[in-house]
């Protein structure tokens, strides 16, 4: 963890008082499960906390930055900023991917490069930083790492297929859109999900992905392509 501590201090001017929090943030469940006798904590609880503080800080930023935008527009932009792929990208930008502790099976299957794991890692780090330093330090870190990309308009170019599908269908009248998991295959470290998108309980299309969120986006993308051919 010494190299990680040096990275945080040199790149972001962050120094943890409670080193155990930092280590927990970078410990995946697969590693903790393989070392049960050591009673090692993993990062899922910190991820929960980090997700909450990230949503709050980004919401506050968008509210202040875009006084004329509607609630719907701000929600759409926020969802692209905090989506799995975006957070995984920030983990890579910060070089966090080099320091996460993974189980042997997860490591062999490419877990170090998986968006789901890296996105969760970024949130877990925020949770640990919140507990160790407080919300203003989390805000400072996000202002350094995330906000510059927001201000460059990076996320306004990202397609949220679920939102696009919802807007298209609801423009034609009130409809109920639902996403249902059809199948879940593969070992825990390499899951593959198949999801169907239903409109008023009728199946419109299907999609696949390494997580439920990615499979839902793929299903919505396929539905939009299908509707464009009608």
Swiss-Prot record:
Its main location: cytoplasm. Residues 160-229 form the DRBM domain. The active site is at 51, 123. GO terms for molecular function: double-stranded RNA binding; metal ion binding; ribonuclease III activity; rRNA binding. It comes from the Bacteria. The gene is rnc. One of its GO terms (biological process) is rRNA processing. It is found in: Cytoplasm. Digests double-stranded RNA. Involved in the processing of primary rRNA transcript to yield the immediate precursors to the large and small rRNAs (23S and 16S). Processes some mRNAs, and tRNAs when they are encoded in the rRNA operon. Processes pre-crRNA and tracrRNA of type II CRISPR loci if present in the organism. This is Ribonuclease 3. Its EC number is 3.1.26.3. SMART domains: DSRM, RIBOc. Residues 5-134 form the RNase III domain. Mg(2+) binds at residues 47, 120, 123. Homodimer.
């Amino acid at each position: 963890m010494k190299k990680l501590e040096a990275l945080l201090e040199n790149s972001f001017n962050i120094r943890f008082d409670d080193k155990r929090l930092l280590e927990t943030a970078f410990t995946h469940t697969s590693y903790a499960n393989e070392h049960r006798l050591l009673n090692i904590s993993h990062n899922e609880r910190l991820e929960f906390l980090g997700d909450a503080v990230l949503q709050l800080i980004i919401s506050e930023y968008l509210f202040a930055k875009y006084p004329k935008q509607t609630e719907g527009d701000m929600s759409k932009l926020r969802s692209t900023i905090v989506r799995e792929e975006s957070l995984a990208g920030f983990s890579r930008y910060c070089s966090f991917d080099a320091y996460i502790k993974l189980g042997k099976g997860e490591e062999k299957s490419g877990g170090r490069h998986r968006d789901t794991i890296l996105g969760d890692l970024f949130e877990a780090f925020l949770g640990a930083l919140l507990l160790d330093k407080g919300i203003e330090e989390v805000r400072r870190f996000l202002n350094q790492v995330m906000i510059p990309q927001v201000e460059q308009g990076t996320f306004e170019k990202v397609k949220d297929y679920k939102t696009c599908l919802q807007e298209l269908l609801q423009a034609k009248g009130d409809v109920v859109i639902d996403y249902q998991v059809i199948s879940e295959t593969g070992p825990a470290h390499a899951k593959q999900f198949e999801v169907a998108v239903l409109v008023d309980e009728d199946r419109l299309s299907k999609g696949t992905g390494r997580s439920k969120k990615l499979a839902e986006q793929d299903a919505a993308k396929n539905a939009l392509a299908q509707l464009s051919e009608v």
